[in-house]
């Protein structure tokens, strides 16, 4: 019975061990979408601009509070020394009483030259601008994650090609050594094969170093080690048909342009706000007070007021007019920044489009080159085996094929990255991956508001 239990436990343990690698592979596998999402959600740059957005949300709440009444309470008590006519009329030179007073005031805005309206309008625009800055930063960080992800895949493919190249050169060395031992070759061929093998091993070592650098970059950007990465594909329907369509989409949708547009709206509201200084300020002020034992009198006083109060500055040294001119220049500055951003986004989009086209053409050219080199290598190998081709020609053909395959892999991943770079320039990288932007990137997220928040 004991032997049976022991055998059963061993079988279960063996099954668990066999299943563990499969589970581990599934747990460690990461898609491009997951890598970008992790990078955006954990990157402190995104956190920084998101917190700036939340701070401006609170400034918007402060602006909306200007429409609401302001209520203040005041209470005070303490000894009061009095020597006045009232005290003397009572036949005393002076008197000290414990003065007690309390008051409540309510002030309600009636008209302030549209200052509050402009403040709310400005803060809504600033919230919109901050939200687009969050989205812009998310797109940039997402593109960094895409680049680091593709770099790891590219260098892994290059390592595989370099390892195959080393294996081929080892086979060539074994072949010429066997010939030399059989008396059908010479020592020069052996030395040449050894030298080429060393060169192939050196190339492999260099590519492995490049892979480690790419993995280090991935860890910095994504925050996790790149274990099993899945090859991504760009959906065909998300890439515009031509460069001008791409530029138009970028200028319309790029978060870089959108936050500049919002900055212009904020600047316009600033100008309106400064104009409020040319108008009177009108408020309803309600007040009530209770005072006990004041001015030497042992009695209690009650007061209540309901006033409409107007305040109107007549002269401030020309500061108001100068401030209006200042903010008009600020508005013009914001418009110029918008034009600068539009031009920069258009340039980035055209550069990305050109990179995509060039890399696509390179892929086609290099595929033909690889195919031609494979055919050449195969012919040279057959000729070498029957003594019609020298070893050096075959080794050169092997090397040309290795270099062409390495260049093709680089071109393929360069083309893939160029597509994602184009999407990022249009502000649609996250959408193309099926990702929802973080909450702080939504300009409408602050619309729900309560005066008691």
Where are the regions that the model predicts?
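Bacterial Sec-pathway N-terminal export signals of envelope proteins
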Residues: 24-76, 82, 109-110, 225-265, ...
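Metallo-beta-lactamase
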Residues: 207, 255, 411
């Amino acid at each position: 019975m004991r032997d049976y239990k022991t055998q059963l436990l061993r079988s279960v343990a063996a099954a668990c061990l066999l299943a563990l690698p499969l589970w581990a592979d599934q747990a460690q596998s990461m898609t491009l979408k997951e890598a970008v999402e992790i990078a955006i959600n954990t990157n402190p740059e995104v956190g920084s601009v998101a917190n700036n957005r939340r701070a401006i949300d609170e400034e918007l709440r402060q602006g909306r509070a200007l429409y609401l009444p302001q209520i203040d309470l005041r209470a005070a008590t303490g000894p009061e020394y009095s020597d006045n006519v009232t005290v003397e009329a009572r036949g005393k030179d002076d008197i000290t009483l414990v003065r007690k007073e309390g008051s409540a005031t309510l002030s309600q805005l009636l008209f302030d030259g549209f200052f509050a309206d402009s403040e709310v309008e400005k803060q809504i625009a600033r919230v919109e601008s901050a939200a687009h800055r969050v989205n812009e930063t998310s797109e940039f960080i997402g593109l960094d994650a895409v680049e680091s992800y593709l770099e790891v895949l590219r260098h892994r493919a290059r390592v595989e090609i370099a390892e195959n190249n080393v294996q081929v050169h080892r086979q060539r060395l074994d072949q010429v050594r066997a010939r030399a031992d059989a008396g059908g070759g010479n020592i020069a061929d052996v030395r040449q094969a050894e030298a080429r093998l060393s060169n192939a091993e050196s190339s492999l070592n260099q590519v492995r170093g490049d892979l480690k650098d790419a993995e280090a970059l991935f860890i910095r950007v994504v925050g996790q080690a790149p274990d099993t990465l899945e090859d991504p594909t760009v959906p065909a329907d998300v890439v515009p048909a031509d460069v001008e369509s791409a530029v138009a989409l970028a200028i319309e949708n790029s978060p870089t342009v959108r936050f500049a547009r919002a900055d212009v709206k904020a600047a316009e509201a600033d100008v309106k706000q400064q104009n409020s200084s040319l108008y009177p300020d009108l408020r309803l002020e309600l007040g009530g007070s209770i005072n006990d034992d004041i001015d030497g009198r042992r009695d209690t006083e009650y007061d209540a007021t309901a006033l409409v109060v107007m305040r109107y500055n007549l002269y401030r040294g020309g500061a108001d007019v100068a401030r209006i001119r200042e903010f008009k220049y600020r508005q013009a500055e914001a418009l110029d920044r918008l034009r600068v951003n539009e031009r920069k986004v258009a340039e980035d989009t055209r550069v990305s489009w050109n990179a995509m086209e060039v890399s696509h053409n390179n892929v086609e050219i290099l595929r033909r080159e690889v195919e031609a080199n494979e055919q050449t290598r195969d012919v040279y190998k057959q000729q070498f085996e029957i003594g019609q081709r020298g070893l050096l020609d075959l080794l050169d053909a092997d090397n040309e094929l290795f270099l062409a395959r390495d260049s093709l892999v680089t071109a393929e991943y360069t083309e893939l990255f160029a597509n994602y770079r184009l999407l990022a320039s249009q502000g649609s990288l996250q959408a193309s991956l099926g990702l929802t932007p973080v909450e702080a990137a939504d300009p409408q997220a602050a619309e729900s508001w309560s005066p008691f928040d």
